[in-house]
């Protein structure tokens, strides 16, 4: 059993045993239980790992050795993509400035690790932050980059500004509580909650609330929950089991037409229905923060947009794009 459990961790960091022996546990890239490795295997592909871009590609994707050439890199955004880009740049011997608008690093990993059954994701934040600090990345917190303060000479700029919760044109949408705010303990919810959106974030938030004795209903316009989620079947089945075991109710094929602070009205099959509640949680998705892209392209020769700033996706795409954006630098 222990060897089976270790197998995933060995994909995340094959040097795990050596780091443990040397008492460098803080340098171990943690398995977050996303099962991207299994998804790859079940799809007939070679195995890959969300937190390790070199998994099964140690030679193909190895970093060029530092040659003494100094390069200056600007990273905008301190989420997983930005942190991995900064770490990779320092490992290549480059100078790095990382600017993050919030007061801490981590980005959307914080809400991703918010549910009671996904705490392993928080270990990834700690690992990435530790590597940034050990490598002396020049980190600027509470420092949003805008068109008015963008300055400096950089050989490459990485736009990794992440994403922002979407606000579709539904009457009353501005009265909702963001699922990301709930999952990061910036907002509380009442006993009876309606969650709009049953993708991964909405379903996980609903399960977390239900696990705290909440009365939760998911309202989803698609035919089923997790309809567009591209994740491993194991994770899908596990999350559906939590939905069932915790008594989360589901209203699928439901188009939300109106929201108040204590109700959600939706249409289905020509009929209009209203759910009363204490709190309405908004989990309808995210949109990329890429407004600086055109300005960066005008000012700098090398610009790479990565992670959720391209489109809201997975931890895997964020980590891998952060690594490869720096790996390919000449």
Summary of predicted features, one role per range:
Residues 2, 7, 155, 191, ...:
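Conserved acidic residues
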Residues 2, 22-24, 114-118, 234-237, ...:
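Short, hinge-like loop/turn segments at secondary-structure boundaries
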Residues 70-99, 105, 141-148, 160-170, ...:
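Rossmann-like dinucleotide/flavin-binding elements
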Residues 1-76, 80, 84, 88-91, ...:
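Flavin-dependent oxidoreductase catalytic cores
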Residues 6, 142, 253:
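Short beta-strand and adjacent tight-turn residues that come in two discontinuous sequence segments
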Residues 126-166, 257-266:
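Feature captures the FAD/FMN-dependent oxidoreductase FAD-binding
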Residues 65-73, 203, 254-264:
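Surface beta-strand/loop "capping" patches
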Residues 95-135, 184, 207-254, 310:
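Rossmann-like dinucleotide-binding cores of NAD(P)H-dependent redox enzymes
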């Amino acid at each position: 059993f222990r060897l089976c459990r270790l197998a995933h961790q060995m994909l995340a960091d094959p040097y795990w045993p050596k780091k443990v022996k040397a008492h460098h546990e803080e340098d171990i890239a943690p398995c977050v239980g996303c099962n991207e490795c299994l998804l790859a295997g079940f799809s007939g592909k070679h195995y890959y790992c969300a937190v390790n871009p070199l998994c099964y590609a140690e030679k193909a994707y190895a970093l060029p050795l530092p040659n003494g050439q100094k390069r200056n890199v600007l990273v905008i955004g301190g989420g997983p993509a930005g942190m991995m880009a900064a770490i990779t740049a320092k490992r290549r011997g480059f100078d790095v400035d990382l600017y993050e608008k919030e007061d801490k690093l981590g980005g959307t990993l914080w809400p991703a690790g918010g549910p009671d059954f996904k705490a392993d994701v928080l270990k990834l934040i700690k690992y990435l932050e530790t590597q940034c600090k050990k490598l002396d990345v020049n980190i600027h917190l509470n420092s949003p980059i805008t068109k008015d303060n963008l300055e400096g000479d950089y050989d490459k700029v990485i736009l990794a500004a992440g994403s922002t919760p979407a606000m579709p044109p539904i009457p009353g949408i501005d009265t909702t509580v963001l699922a990301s705010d709930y999952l990061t303990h910036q907002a509380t919810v009442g006993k009876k909650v309606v969650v709009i959106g049953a993708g991964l974030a909405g379903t996980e938030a609903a399960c977390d609330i239900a696990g705290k004795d909440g009365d939760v209903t998911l309202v989803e316009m698609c035919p089923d929950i997790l309809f567009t989620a591209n994740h491993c079947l194991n994770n899908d089945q596990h999350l559906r089991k939590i939905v069932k075991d915790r008594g989360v109710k589901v209203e699928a094929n439901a188009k939300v037409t109106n929201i108040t602070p204590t109700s959600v009205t939706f249409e289905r099959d020509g009929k209009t229905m209203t759910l009363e509640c204490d709190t309405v949680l908004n989990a309808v998705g995210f949109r990329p923060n890429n407004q600086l892209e055109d300005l960066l392209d005008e000012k700098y020769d090398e610009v790479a947009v990565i992670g959720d700033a391209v489109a809201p996706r997975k931890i895997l795409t964020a980590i891998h794009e952060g690594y490869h954006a720096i790996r390919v630098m000449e």
